[in-house]
Amino acid sequence: MSTLVTVEHLAKSFGDHQVLQDISFGAEAGTVTCIIGPSGSGKTTLLRSLNALEIPDRGIVTIGDCTVDFATITPGPRGRLPKAQRELLAALRAKSGMVYQSHNLFPHKTALENVIEGPVVVQGEAVAEATVRGRELLERVGLSAHADKYPFQLSGGQQQRVGIARALAGRPSVVLFDEPTSALDPELVGDVLGVMKSLAAEGWTMIVVTHELRFAQQVADQVLFIDGGLVVESGPPSEVIANPQHPRTQAFLTRLLEPI
């Protein structure tokens, strides 16, 4: 396998608060990377930085043949990025599909319309072609019978599966998941994780921010434990989750696994 995603010395601050201090890691094509850590540790900011939804202060992100050195991304006098930089960020975003914590579906569009929005509007794909593929993707996530329903007519788990289909519609190199089950009722979590497990089995490259330790143990090729904007510990789940070496990782997992 070859390295598909490379992150080098990523840093990001919001005012005086440094969320990411110095993050570096790599992910090989066809593998699943799970990111765990306490609230406020920088997990979501890291994920959003990979497709430039957040612009890091410095650091380099490479996905496939697209590399962005964020130290060179500098707004012009009116706060607008130069055209070449906007195009570079757009090229990076095109390499990934994002599945959000709270679905982020367009409420006035059907499930199918949500799925084909990106390919048609952003990528210029013909509506007929995008529709055929959109229906295939909804079938892929078990929602072929719900293509014409609006988000308010779907359960939270169904909405999240529409979100997964939408992320896949752009044919991304890597799929980014930001706590995809944290907003769901417990009985709906299994359906979403089932889709994610099948995607992993099919060889999709996935980077997943999650608190689902069992999923990480079963599916992840590597786990990153992040705290204080740093990668404190990384490795296969058999090491990081089952046999953590760093005291911060041990303390976090102990709290997470404590009986209620």
What are these regions (language model features)?
Residues 3-237:
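ABC family nucleotide-binding domain
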